[in-house]
Amino acid sequence: LCIFLFSVASQSIFSNTIELETLIRNDEGKLAIVVDSSDPNISNLARRAFALHGGIVVTEELVEALFFVKIEPAGDSSALLTLGSGQPYTEQLRRTVSGRDLQNAVLRACDMVVKATLQSEGFFAGRLAFVCKQNGFSELYTSDLLFTRISPLTADRALITGPKWSPDGRSLLFTSYFKSGFPDIYRIDVDSRRKTPIATFKGLNSGGTFS
């Protein structure tokens, strides 16, 4: 049994974390788009991403869509995005989007669609930080938004709470009962997984956040 305790932050398609405003829409207020690709994996990935957005709905009928989105592979870690609308069709955006890999590039392209059509920041290419508690122990993990690539950051077999992203999205602050058995604050580099103690004073150290 694995219990997920989420303290989730998203990393933007750029280096900095972003704050997303609450957006509530009725179905009739959603932006209808058509998504196409010669690669079925890319098409499915883009559709899964857009399905998470409250302001966009993917339709199969071109006549019902305000925009036509086409995403094609352009290398191992890049995708070609074209965006257009109208009858007759008019191309409005063409961009080669690079990423850490092809999947990340496709999600970044989806973020560009959100920015171009809704004038708001996308979040599909972000990374999530969360705590998973299993067998009485909790560890810190990161994942892409669709949970297709989950990576452990710690293996301490200790209670962990409250991960917080740094402003540049490269590290996390969290509270851990590692070593002392009492709550201490640590900072961990997401790429190297190097952990640094920040606050290990006597008493309770918790709730660390970046200012």
Q: Which ranges hold each PLM region?
A:
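A structural "domain/chain start" motif
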Residues: 12-48
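Amphipathic beta-strand/beta-sheet edge segments enriched in Tyr/Trp
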Residues: 47, 63-112
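Conserved blade-register residue in beta-propeller folds
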Residues: 83, 141-142, 187
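Conserved beta-propeller blade repeats
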Residues: 116, 157-175, 195-196, 200-211
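Residue-level detector of Asp-centered blade-edge/turn motifs that repeat once per structural unit
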Residues: 120-124, 167-168
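A flexible loop/linker signature enriched in serine peptidases of the S9 family
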Residues: 121, 132-140, 157, 176-184, ...
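Residue position within the beta-strands of beta-propeller blades
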Residues: 127-132, 171-175
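Short loop/turn segments that connect beta-strands within beta-propeller blades
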Residues: 144-148, 189-193
